[in-house]
């Protein structure tokens, strides 16, 4: 296992911290969401994280969600969104069903550009976007009528 974790082969000591939030709403009109960020430090250090949405019904705000992620990513590096979106799409593809799980999002790992402050700011931005998207988009759906 040490061979699989950058920097752990040289020294098995490490530090890790992270935040993981999973939203499982009562209303089927509000999609399930997952968000996580992490910082790992071995003899090397990097950030990782992401977020994705898995709706129960057609999710009309999918384009708005992806556009917001793209704007966030482009603020730091224009290559982030296409790269991180593909990583998420590949990670959450259900091969046995030949279909994606949900509408995707972004996923990244081993983010270490050499500018720790900028990398940390991006990770904070991911968390802020998750919060803002729930507050500004999903909360409005909580009072919509649902027929069971």
What are these regions (language model features)?
Residues 2-63:
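Aromatic- and glycine-enriched beta-alpha-beta binding-site module
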Residues 45-147:
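Long, contiguous internal "core" modules enriched in hydrophobic/ aromatic residues
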